[in-house]
Curated annotation (Swiss-Prot):
Residues 21-55, 59-94 form the Pacifastin domain. Its main location: secreted. It comes from Platymeris rhadamanthus (Red spot assassin bug). It is found in: Secreted. This is U-reduvitoxin-Pr12a.
Length: 96
């Protein structure tokens, strides 16, 4: 399971790497809980690596046990249908 999570976050990081950031700025990593520095070319540089980021919990009403999207994050509804656990990806929307 840990290997699958690491692979997932690595793929997210690669996809996120193409987004521009402000050189010299500290930026939230794609997983939503680690931090990265922005290089002079606008790409992400070194990041902290807290391997397991806790999922965010949201209060809402949803269909028990069903997965759904919340912006760019993947969520799963709790068994009671009152909360959901979601990934913590940083969602960046491209300008039209």
């Amino acid at each position: 399971m840990k290997t699958a999570l690491l692979l997932f976050f690595a793929l997210v990081f690669i996809a996120f790497e193409t987004e521009a950031c402000r050189p010299g700025a500290l930026t939230v990593a794609p997983d939503g809980c680690n931090m990265c520095t922005c290089l002079s070319n606008g790409k992400l540089g070194r990041c902290t690596h807290d391997l397991i980021c806790p999922p965010r919990m949201f209060k809402l009403e949803c269909e028990p046990g069903k997965p759904f999207k919340n912006d760019c994050n993947d969520c799963i509804c709790s068994e009671d249908g009152l909360t959901a656990k979601c990934t913590r990806k940083l969602c960046i929307h491209k300008k039209p």
